[in-house]
Amino acid sequence: MAVYIAREATKLWRKVCAEIAVELQLLFEKWRLLLAGLVFQYIHGLAARGVHYLHRPGPLLQDLGFMALPELGQDKGYVSESVFTFIFISFLLWSFHPFIYHSKRFYTVLLWRRVLAFLVASQFLRIITFYSTQLPGPNYHCREGSKMATLPPPHNVLEVLLINFPRGVLFGCGDLIFSSHMIFTLVFVRTYHKYGSKRLIKILAWLMAIIQSLLIIASRKHYSVDVVVAWYTVNLVVFFIDNKLPEMPDRTNGSSLLPVTAKDKDGRTKEELHKLEKDCKMKEEFHKLLNGNTVDSTDRRQRVQMNGKHGEDINHTLSDATPNGT
């Protein structure tokens, strides 16, 4: 038993090392895009922190979701956060499963490049919307009478840049339209729906996205419009960007080979074009042979001249032979 475990552990370690080597090569090629996506996460947090200084508490707006869903209460606000944390960690672990399991449908680096592209585009639109109009926050710490509803002017730039993480992120106000939690949730769910392999998990993922939407409204963390706008905005963003980005190579066969680089692809394309031109020429000649049009006008003139010369040679030979015959 111990020998079997040791042998399997060795195989697993070799597999992990091989996958790390492959992913590191991809990381060296794509690190700029990944770094830009991570930096924008900080910019998004900084923008949310900045709008908190502009937030002014007021009476809650009339909301259909608030009327339809019972209020969970301040002491149960952790429920929606727990669901979101579960979705986030589950997706994070799944995105690294090619390092361990045989079934590999994607490269982790390329997957996260797409995910960050979806997140950045959605968050950029979100920043524009919540700076365009500041609504009175429905969350408990954003209501009238709360000390955290409005932030005092910052004493220095460093206070703004540090964004009071993580408290400043969890207890922000003013960054409403549209929900950041729903951006992450929908991007993760849509990504798994495309690259995941378990149909049951796909159904459960969409179900959890719906439950997360209802919990956010019931917890009074966002208005219903914030969730509704997130649903169609994020889905449209993912749809358009996904069509613009090059499709990731399929790894269903378990291959650990790197995808073809642009340089290799260009070289291969030139060879394929050269072969294609050759094939086209051969096909044209074949069709000409079938149709009786084997030569062009230049070749025809040359052949006519050759035939004429050949005829003259024959006549000359015959004329020379005639006296000898008589």
From Swiss-Prot:
List the top taxonomic levels of the source: Eukaryota, Viridiplantae, Streptophyta, Embryophyta, Tracheophyta
- Its EC number(s): 2.7.8.-
PANTHER family recorded? PHOSPHATIDYLINOSITOL:CERAMIDE INOSITOLPHOSPHOTRANSFERASE, SPHINGOMYELIN SYNTHETASE
What name is this protein filed under?
Answer: Phosphatidylinositol:ceramide inositolphosphotransferase
Secretion signal span: none
Give the function comment from the record: Catalyzes the transfer of the phosphorylinositol group from phosphatidylinositol (PI) to phytoceramide, an essential step in sphingolipid biosynthesis. May play an important role in modulating plant programmed cell death (PCD) associated with defense by promoting sphingolipid metabolism and regulating ceramide accumulation.
Which enzyme type, at the first EC level? transferase
GO CC, one annotated term: trans-Golgi network
State the disulfide connectivity: none
**Species of origin:** Oryza sativa subsp. japonica (Rice)
**Which parts of the chain span the membrane according to its record?**
33-53, 82-102, 115-135, 169-189, 199-219, 222-242
The keyword Kinase is assigned to this record:
no
Upon gene disruption, the observed phenotype is:
Reduced plant stature. Spontaneous HR-like cell death (SHL).
Going by the entry's taxonomy, the superkingdom of the source organism is recorded as: Eukaryota
The family note in this entry says:
Belongs to the sphingomyelin synthase family.
Name a GO molecular-function annotation. Answer: inositol phosphoceramide synthase activity
UniProt record, GO biological process: ceramide biosynthetic process; defense response
The keyword Chloroplast is assigned to this record: no
Q: Which Pfam families match?
A: PAP2_C (PF14360)
